[in-house]
């Protein structure tokens, strides 16, 4: 799943960085879904031994290059994808009637700030949340609000709290989990409406008929575990502020343990070379 900061709603998706990169692993036997966010500033081989931030691969070669980057650096075999923008996400959430969210004071402040731009880009309205009295710990999650599409999308954009981009990606995975859970309880008629409303806003490797055939099975699946990649890293100023896996080899081993319950995975020669 790629998320694009796509400002011009009248042009096709492409040419922008994918500031959201989420890998979904679906186990059709257990009906379990695992999600892994690849941090956008992760230093990876984007192709031809060009090392840069992972989010730049989409801008260089759209989904094809971004998927190749993931497959070659992480020893994966991803073949399907979907790319969404702010408008698609706000529409999904509004069609579901919004989301109930527990938040910190800091998250409320930043969400309200992001809402201004998100509303302008999507053409959708929102009501700013009135700030409570400032607590001693502004990072403590202690407030509960019902968010509409603009607000929940803005919540997904927050990256200026103490948890930085790790917190941003965790919020995104949390919202996806909430969307899946609410869609399952909403029923097929709502799911099909969302499909009709959102599909024109999505770029995907799958056709609409294929997706429609899959939707009835959604109710049986659950997103049960999520994490971020890399799990072990350091910050560096190589080619800008980047996240450097320490090392790529060990992180790929941990990734395969998480995604596939494989405790004895041996990374490929390509991963070993990229890990140097």
Question: Language-model segments: which ranges?
Answer:
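Non-catalytic, solvent-exposed segments at the cell envelope interface
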Residues: 1-276
């Amino acid at each position: 799943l790629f998320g694009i900061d796509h400002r011009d709603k009248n042009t096709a998706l492409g040419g922008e960085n994918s500031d959201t990169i989420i890998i979904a692993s679906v186990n059709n036997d257990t009906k379990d879904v695992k999600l892994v966010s690849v941090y956008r500033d992760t230093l990876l081989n984007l192709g031809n031994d060009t090392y840069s931030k992972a989010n730049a691969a989409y801008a260089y070669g759209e989904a094809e290059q971004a998927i190749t980057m993931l497959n070659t650096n992480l020893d994966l075999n991803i073949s399907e994808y979907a790319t969404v923008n702010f408008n698609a996400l706000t529409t999904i959430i509004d069609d579901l009637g919004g989301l109930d969210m527990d938040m910190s004071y800091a998250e409320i402040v930043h969400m309200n700030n992001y809402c201004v731009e998100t509303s302008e880009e999507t053409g959708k309205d929102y009501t700013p949340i009135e700030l409570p009295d400032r607590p001693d710990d502004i990072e403590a999650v202690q407030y509960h609000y019902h968010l509409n599409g603009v607000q929940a999308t803005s919540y997904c954009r927050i990256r200026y709290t103490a948890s930085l981009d790790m917190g941003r990606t965790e919020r995104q995975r949390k919202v996806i989990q909430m969307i899946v859970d609410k869609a399952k309880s909403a029923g097929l008629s709502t799911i099909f409406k969302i499909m009709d409303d959102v599909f024109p806003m999505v770029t995907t490797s799958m056709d609409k008929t294929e997706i429609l055939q899959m939707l009835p099975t959604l109710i049986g699946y659950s997103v049960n575990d999520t994490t971020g990649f890399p799990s072990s890293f350091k910050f560096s100023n190589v080619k800008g502020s980047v996240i450097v896996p320490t090392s790529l080899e060990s992180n790929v081993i941990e990734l395969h343990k998480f995604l596939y319950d494989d405790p004895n995975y041996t990374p490929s020669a390509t991963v070993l070379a990229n890990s140097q």
